[in-house]
Amino acid sequence: MPARKTAGSVGYDIAACLSEDTVIPPGETRMIGSGVAIALDPGYAAFIYARSGLGIKHGVVPANCVGVVDSDYRGEIIVGLKNTSNEQFTVCDGDRVAQMVIAKCEIPELVLSGDLDETPRGGGGFGSTGND
C-alpha cells in the first residue's frame, strides 16, 4: 500500500511487488511492478516521480522521467527504472522505487489559433528571462 512517511510528505512511496529480485544492469531499464492500482476521481491525476535517494546514491531513475496516471486508468502502476550508473543495481520485493503525488488538474478546452497575444517575453525561452 503506498504510504506517506511523514505528516508533511506530499508523495506516497511506491514499493516494488516482485516474486524475485530484479537486477538492472548499467545503462538498462527494467519494468518494476507495484501491485497497486488506483481509481482517481475525474479531474485528478497521479504523477510518479523519482525517489531522490535512488537517483543520487545509485543512479537509478524513472525511465520516462515522470509517469502520469490518468483518472480513467485502472491497471497496475508499473515503474520503468533506468540504471544510469556503472554498477548493476538489484531491486528487491518491498523496496521503495518511486513516489506518487496526486494532484487536481484543470483540463482546458484547446482552441486552434493563428494569433497569439503579444507579451513582453514573446517567444524567448531557454534562459532568455535571465538576460537583461
Predicted regions and their residues:
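DUTPase catalytic domain/fold
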Residues: 1-132
